[in-house]
Amino acid sequence: MSSIHPTAVIGSGATIGEDVQIGPYTVIDDDVVIGDRTVIAPHVYIADGARIGSECRIHSGAVLSTAPQDLKYAGEKTELYVGDRTVIRECVTLNRGTKASGKTVVGSDNLLMAYVHAGHDCVIGNHVVIANSVQFGGHCEVGDYVVVGGLAGIHQFVRIGRYAMVGGISRGALDVPPFVMAGGHNSFRYEGLNVIGLKRRGFTSEQISTIRDVYRVIFQSGLLLSNALEAVRRDFEQTPEVKEILGFFASGAHGRKFLKPFNS
């Protein structure tokens, strides 16, 4: 049975799952779905369009699924999706999508620490850790198992590949490919592989060595990027990791450039 504090304001059209806990003074609009066994702390606002999964933990001051901060937004119906078992800490703000994609997505098993903001149409994968006060502009894409350090500022449309780590207090408008560490106060730069993260996730020494060799060609050979990628296609066994790296570089959009070598 769900437990809803008498001071909470729940829209008559909201769908509340089994064994949900909702704290004092929380407000939930009509067009909202809350999954089973999710716990919502006091003083949370969940606006129309939110689709929250099961076993999430939403802490005080969080504001979810409010209108996108986009001058082109004209009130069209859009949504925010949050997967299962995601923890949303104090004062996190997640805007719903615009007509560009119709939705903002935050996956499952994520930790969004206090004061994180994800703008409209962002897509955040699974098993992602985003530290305090990280700010994502609209349309960002974050792969699975990414870690973003506190106070980082991520420009709109930036993509961060799987298993990457972005350093704290960094900011950038460049795409960050999978498996790497990136940082920099003016522009993201390549700072080596996320070796500790890869080992924790079960990557073998051979896999890590291959990934390192690929990025040496891409970032440290002195070749133009197009020539470096061709060398990787020609000279390396096309393992899943190599294919993922090449696929990431092949799928860039919006004229977005990739992070720079650390010595540039």
UniProtKB/Swiss-Prot annotation:
One of its GO terms (molecular function) is acyl-[acyl-carrier-protein]-UDP-N-acetylglucosamine O-acyltransferase activity. One of its GO terms (cellular component) is cytoplasm. InterPro entries: Acetyltransf_C, Acetyltransf_C_sf, Hexapep, Lipid_A_LpxA, Trimer_LpxA-like_sf. It is found in: Cytoplasm. It holds the Pfam family Acetyltransf_11. It is an enzyme of class 2 (transferase). Keywords: Acyltransferase, Cytoplasm, Lipid A biosynthesis, Lipid biosynthesis, Lipid metabolism, Repeat, Transferase. Pathway: Glycolipid biosynthesis; lipid IV(A) biosynthesis; lipid IV(A) from (3R)-3-hydroxytetradecanoyl-[acyl-carrier-protein] and UDP-N-acetyl-alpha-D-glucosamine: step 1/6. Gene3D superfamilies: Hexapeptide repeat proteins, Udp N-acetylglucosamine O-acyltransferase, C-terminal domain. Its EC number is 2.3.1.129. It catalyses: a (3R)-hydroxyacyl-[ACP] + UDP-N-acetyl-alpha-D-glucosamine = a UDP-3-O-[(3R)-3-hydroxyacyl]-N-acetyl-alpha-D-glucosamine + holo-[ACP]. GO terms for biological process: lipid A biosynthetic process. The keyword Lipid metabolism applies. Involved in the biosynthesis of lipid A, a phosphorylated glycolipid that anchors the lipopolysaccharide to the outer membrane of the cell. Homotrimer. PANTHER family: ACYL-[ACYL-CARRIER-PROTEIN]--UDP-N-ACETYLGLUCOSAMINE O-ACYLTRANSFERASE, ACYL-[ACYL-CARRIER-PROTEIN]--UDP-N-ACETYLGLUCOSAMINE O-ACYLTRANSFERASE, MITOCHONDRIAL-RELATED. Belongs to the transferase hexapeptide repeat family. LpxA subfamily. This is Acyl-[acyl-carrier-protein]--UDP-N-acetylglucosamine O-acyltransferase. The gene is lpxA.
